[in-house]
Structure formats: C-alpha cells, structure tokens
Amino acid sequence: MGQTNSRHSLIETDEPTTSSRVSMLVDRVKLLWKRYTTPLSTEDGSREAHFAVPSENYADTPSRNTPNSSNGFPSETLVTSSAHCSTQPHKDEAYSHHGYSSTMALDDSSLAQTYHEYEEGTSGNSPLRRAIGSYDFLHPRPSGNSSRLDRNSSRPFTSSFHSAPFLSSYGSSNDPSQERVNEYSLPSNSNSTYTTPLQSINNEHPLPTVLENNALLNNSGNSPSLINHLRQYLNQDFSRLHQSPSPIPNSNDNDSQTRRSSWSSIASAFNDFPEEFPNASNPEAHSNFTPLNGNDESTVNMLSRLLSAAAIETVASIMNSEARNMDSQNMANGEPSRFRSVDGSFEQFLTDLRSGNLTNVLQNSSQNGNDQISSDPESNSSDLQYLRMFRFPSFHQSHNQPASNNEASDTNGPALVPVLIVCMRSISETSEDHAPTMTQENQSLHNESRENISINDITERMAQSTEFSTDLPPTFERSNSTFSHPEPTRSDFSQAFTPVSDFPANLFPGSRNLFPTSNSGNQSTSSFSRYNQPTVSVDLRNSSILRRAQEPVNGSTGENHIGDDYISSLLDSSNSNSQRPFSTVPSESNVFSRNASGNFSMSQTHQPTTDNTSSFSTQPGRLSTGLHHFPSDRDLLSNQTRRSSLARSYRFEEQLSVDDNTSDFSTLASNGAADMVTQTHSEGTFSNSTHGDWLIYVFGGLFPEHHPVLSTVSLFSDNPMYEDLLALTTYLGPAKKPVASHEDVKRSGGLFAYFDDASLSSADSCLICLETYTNGDICRKLQACKHFFHQACIDQWLTTGNNSCPLCRAHGVTTQAEEEN
C-alpha cells in the first residue's frame, strides 16, 4: 500500500523476550553474517569457507560503512579446508553484499528461525553456530603491523570489537560456543594465509585500564622540559661519577624507539648526566682532562656548569618566538631540537664545558700558547682570556624555508640571525704591590699598549655599551624592574657601597654602572644603575648556582640563617662537608636574611682582613650569594698593576630575588652583559700567594642577515684576526657613555620639595633607588621629559652613569660643550 520498505514481519516467538531484544539480536547477527560467512568453491571442487579478515584499524569502531570495503574490512581472506566447514547451504536463495557471496538468504524469517535454533541449542552445526561460535578465531592478532596497544609482546591483542555488545552477550561462561572445537579451529597448514599460532589467540583479552590508556596517550608529553634539563645539569656533582637516570619514559613499546632517538639527540645537546664524568679519580674519562685537586676541581666544574647553563639559556632567549614555538612543537612530536649552531662549534663548546675542562678550553684559546695557569708565584704569565662567537641559523634557515628578500621584507622584515658571544677572563692577582717599582719607561710602554686592541677591550665594550650602532637592531630588553626585592632605605644603599677609590670608565666592565662612586666625599652613594639598565636575565629555576653557604671566620651573625630545608638543599648540591679556602679583603657587604614574611632583607656585616689560608666551611641552611672583586686601578693591561689592585678593592654581595614557590631567581647584569663573577681559591693549580677571579660574559643578539659582522669569518673561529676584533669594537660602539658634570647638573635646575599631591600620585617611588617618596624629599625634575627622581639619585646617575633619563632614556641635562656647539 505505498510502503517503501517491504520488510516481512518478524515471526513471533514463544520466548518471553521483548521485540526490541529480538530486533537488536537480528541486527547483530545480520551484521556478523554479512562480514564473515561466504562459502565458495575451489578449483578442485571442494567447498572452502571464505572469511574476511578485519583490519587492524577497526579497533576504534566495530563497523564502518565505507563505499570501497565492507564495513572497514579489507579483502584479505582466511582459507580453510572443507573439512572444517559445512558444505550444505542454509537456503537456496543467493545473497551478496559488497562483494561477499553467500548461499543463505538473509530475510527476517530465516534470522528469527536461526535465533530459535540457537536458543534451543539444537543447531550445533548451523551457519549461525559457524558464524558466532568461531568468532574468537576471526579476530587473530596480526603478524605484521600491529596497533600501538599490541607493541608489547607480553600484552595480548585487544580491541573494542572484542568488547562489543553482540559478542559479549554470547561470552558467558556457560556458553558452549566458547569451547575450543576442532571443527571450527583454523589449521596452521600451508593452505592458511595466517601464520600466528592459534594458542596465542584468546577471546577474553583483558582491555587496558584507564591508567594504562592515559599513560600511552600521554607518553609523548612525559618529556622533561628544557628548564628541567638545566636543573638536573646544574644540580649534579661534577666531582663524582654519576649513572644517568634515563629521561626517557620506561616503556617496552616499539614506537618508543623514536622517542628514544629524539631524546638522545636532545640529550646530546645538553648531556645532563654523562655516564662517567672525569674527575681526579677517573682522569681517563676524557682524553684532554687535567686532574685537579679536590677544591680546585669543584670550583672549575662549578664554573663550567654556570657557563654552560648561561649559554644555553641565552641561546634560547635570543631565538625569536616563532622559532621557539616551532622548536617546542618539534620536541613534543619527538623530533630533535633545532637549537644548533651553523658550524657545530657551539655544540663542541658545550662538550668541552661538560667535560669539566674549562681550564684546557681557556689554555687552548689564549693568545699565547705558553700562557697557562702556573703554580709558580713568580710567574708573569698573561691572564687567560677567551672570546668566542657562535652563529645560529635564522628561522627560515632552520626550517629549510628559503625566502626571497622581497618576501622577507613584506612579511616579517629582514631575517635576523641569532649570535651568541661568550667571553671569559681569568685574573690572577698577587698580594705583592709592583706599582711603585714600575719605571717611567715601563709606564710609557704600558700606556702605548693601551692604544692597541685586545680581548680585554672587546669584553669591556660588550659590558659597557647599552645599545649597538644605528645599523644594528636592539639586542637587549630594557627592564625597569626585573625582579622583586624588599624596600630598603636610602641609608642601606648608601652604606652598601664603600668605594675605596674612583672607578675609571675604562676599567672593569660595568664597574661604573654597577657600582657608582662619587668624585666628592660629601655626596651620598646609592645603587641605582642595576635597576634601570638593559639587562639579560638568566632565569634558572631550582638550580644551585647560588654559592654554597660559607661561614665568615670572625664574628658572624646569625641573621643569615635560613630555616628552610628546601633552600638548604639547593645550596648543598655537592659535598656539604668540603672546605673551600680563599683569600679575602676588608669589605662591607650585604647579607640577606629571611624575615617572618618570607622575604629577604639586607643586613650589614664587616669582614676583616684574613690571610690567604683562611677557610670557610660549608654549612647547610645558610645563604650567601656570589662574591665579587672589582679592582679600582686605572691600568687595564698591566699584569703587575692589575695584581696589586685587589688590595684596594671591596666586596659586594649580589642581590637576588628568591621566590619561595618556584625557587626562581634572576641574576642581573649591568648594560646587557651577564656578569657572573666567581672567586677561585689558591690551592693546587693556583699558588697560595695568589687568588683569581673569573669574569664571564654571556649575551647574544639578533643581527640582520646581511650585516658585516656575520660575513667576518674569523670572528666565529678559535683565533679571530686583529682587524676583525677592531671592527667588532666599532660595531659595539663606545665603551664610555656620555656623562654630565656637576656644574651642568646644578645649572639645569628642576629642584623641588616633594609633597603628597594629586598631580604627583602616579610617581610614588623613585625608580633609581626604588624608595617611596616621603613629604619633604628633595627631588630633581629633568627638563626634557619631566620625570623626577631623588636629587642624590639622579645627580649620581647623570654624573657617573649616563646623561639620560633612567626611565625613558631621553636626554638628561644640557652640558657646557653642547651649549657652546
């Protein structure tokens, strides 16, 4: 009567089941029959059963209605002999479906009859029994490409098809179809295309648990991040042998080999845990390693870790954000990191550092091949110096995407090439003062030598210059408040620095900007330049570059005790019972102590002069930051004068911010150079009458692709040429920033007394000393930009730091020379 669906009505059964149950069973049996039963004839006339083998991809869905295949099953067949299958068709009508032929007519009446036969258990050899009773043999474990759930040989093959409702309904323990009947088993003879032993097949495979699935799905996300590699690398003790705990997730999966190879390539860049690290007890671990005595070895290895960590962090910081994001995606996908230098020199440099071989690195790169660290106290060997530049591929080069100049200019501008510059200077100073014995002839020769270029001048300009020339892009980020710290009073800042003599502009890198001194004795000293210079912040989380706690010899106060086991564990990264002797000079320093609120506050400690054999014992629970020596002599290249300069130096405790939750601290440098100065002691390779400082500069920048410095090949080699070094100093700009005189500052005016006014509410603290303004404070306002600061702070800044506004870098005051011009 116009019905489009001419289906026969189902035969009613005597079973107390609902029509929905029958309908579900019919649909399931129909689907099963269409997939698996297809009797056919062979050439010899025997009847063989033709079964469709399910694809390995069917684990996601039990049925797929695709036009080219029967519900997602390929046209592979399993051929069995005629002895195992009935040759009698169930009906005379023929039926075909998607290329699979059958002699049974699948109408609703026949299916209902089959259902009755199954329920009554009288059809042991019926087509339904052949289809359902042997379903466990129709899902064998593939012998070829297997799913990732089956890569473990000890895990049986599982899939969602085994847990499908139409199979689990017949999977009860009292179901006779689960018994292994030889009549329906697949033989392992030559006629079978399936070679997996039958005994390995089971129809009750346990499905993976939720935890196992999550572990497999999230396996690619278990890779440690770069900062974790860095944390592990810094926390290891280079003076001991370490067996590396593998950062690769423990898994027996075959696909983990890809992750292992990718992680091995990443580990080769950082090599956090070498299996055997060279030390005094195992010098054969590295062919070029020179054994050092206990404390010397710890110091050199600590310097190696520090320099390596700073280099890796700086490289990551100068890579543009697009390259960093792409590199993170590559690492997440199991591909190796793309942070590689062009010629591989940076990797070799890190390898030398990871070998604890800092001394040999410096010796091999010194200007004079005979310059070595000697134990002879009368030795006049030059200070070891090291300068290396490393070039990294740009974003387009690293991803093999050559773009024309027009395309680069239209989209993101010219391609910028990351360049890393590493400088180290080892300064060995003697307590003997040779300055009075210097003759006039030697002094004239010394002054003449200052006109020549040297690596000292290079490192000096690197530290002093805050900007490159106009042809170069800005290299360092400007930051007015890079780290948080307590609010000290102005008296604390004025007492924190005890200058002994005036610092010349061409002396130690960053000395004028880091530690400003006044030319007049009545002018207060404040630490201002470190908060407003372009800085490179080396962010190393949970690491141990904080120097180990050291107990002052005479009269130490208990203010520097920190009752925090977590901080103590950071400080005590190696042998907590080791002793580290080194020489000291009279100084006043700041010691940070933790208050009740969890912050660190400064306190003053005076450390008297001690001889060279004085020792400081390492004790956990104490925090002492980096020790800095800054000679105050004007001469730069004279070894004898430089040796005597430390007798008139002072000590400054580097100010750090430590976050209780993340153990995050940042070491700030002046004018864009990461000054990481660590004192070594006089034992073993150093004589007892000498002590030395290491000056380490690690910073980088982005240069245009066609910049002349990138075409200078020798700058990126171990032995740069004199002319190229001279050109590099030109690119870096002048070492000394223009300053104003006291007369120029006084003539500029702008003095006023601060009172809490609505018009000044936006500037509630001085950005130089970071102290909150109080009523009655004398301030000076710059005429060019209208920014104001404490009079003492801004006067010190303009006369000793830079004649510019600390906030906006606008011109400070007009000098007399500018007025004349």
From Swiss-Prot:
Start-end of Low complexity biased regions: 517-529, 568-578
Keyword set includes Zinc: yes
Location of region: Disordered: 1-20, 55-96, 134-205, 240-263, 274-293, 360-381, 430-450, 467-497, 512-535, 549-641
Keyword Isomerase attributed: no
Any one Pfam family match given in the protein's UniProt record, by short name: zf-RING_2
Zinc finger (RING-type): 766-809
Signal peptide: none
Biased composition (Polar residues): 58-88, 185-203, 279-293, 437-450, 579-622
GO molecular function: ubiquitin protein ligase activity; zinc ion binding
Keyword annotations from UniProtKB, A to Z: Metal-binding, Zinc, Zinc-finger
PROSITE patterns, per the entry: ZF_RING_2
Gene Ontology, cellular component aspect: nucleus
PANTHER family assigned to the protein according to its UniProt record, in alphabetical order: RING-H2 FINGER PROTEIN ATL51-RELATED, RING-H2 FINGER PROTEIN ATL66
This protein's name: Uncharacterized RING finger protein C4G3.12c
Species of origin: Schizosaccharomyces pombe (strain 972 / ATCC 24843) (Fission yeast)
